[in-house]
């Protein structure tokens, strides 16, 4: 029998950082020196770029890091620091505090870019994947201060007459990639091709957001794996294991299956379970997630079961916190979050128009680490984003028999995906 070919496209919208508190900075200019307090993730690059933008020598500029309310890449913290610096220079000797409003934060801070992934697979008669093609269309995740051709600040852009803040493009795969992160599949496919269509012009300013392109790429690839398994009439776990030879990858999948009691699952009309797997950046922690969801008026994630191989885990509590936080944030992205905008501006500028997961909606998260003291430590901070999104989407399909390929999984998106429409 000749191979069968399958194609599907997946989409995610622009995403905001959605930190509980907005960006803030304090600056003081005195005695020919400027001192700034900021919750920026990159104080060294920020110091260099503020010095470049304001023509301040490095020996006259001090930038101090303080804790903020949550930053998952490049949010508005650097812009708030630049704002405070400009104002402090205009009021020498007086401390200046800049606190962005909620509307400022949601409208003007850099966003995680929207993207589309188109997947194609040629499969043998038993469903075995013989060839895989992964195409991405996305804006850049790299426009932090210090990485761009011109100073990456709104204030600097304004002072330059509205000059566009240009992105730094796409980091190479050996550094994890950007939009293409986790586009290279972790499965044993005889033929694989990845094409990254980097969009250099986007309607909204974009930059780093937790896991970069891995969130979309893993959501797409793991959703497609479930679809291919269904076409072949095979269990989604068995189908994945049949394409995996890496013993650590297999062990993570097998562990989460036991941990979640996958084989005893009884299907229900409104409750479903689904699985997602990836090795973050193809070089960091292995992560497999099983999601249990209830889909009635809206999607409610009841429970996330997470198995991780991170090698030697030096601080188990800290590592578990990172994975739990990533899984909860990915849940919010997957079922709720989407930046809305019109021809002129971002319109989702408050919690009503840009809802995030409420504390009452946070699912139970059960994280288990596989023994790995004999292996070097692996990064865990962003490994759960993609597998969680895929597991939830696959669980929704299990509950409703509707495959939703566009995030977030809102009632409107589910209705739009129904086959009779």
Language model features with spans:
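Cofactor-binding beta-sheet edge motifs in enzyme active sites
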Residues: 1-421
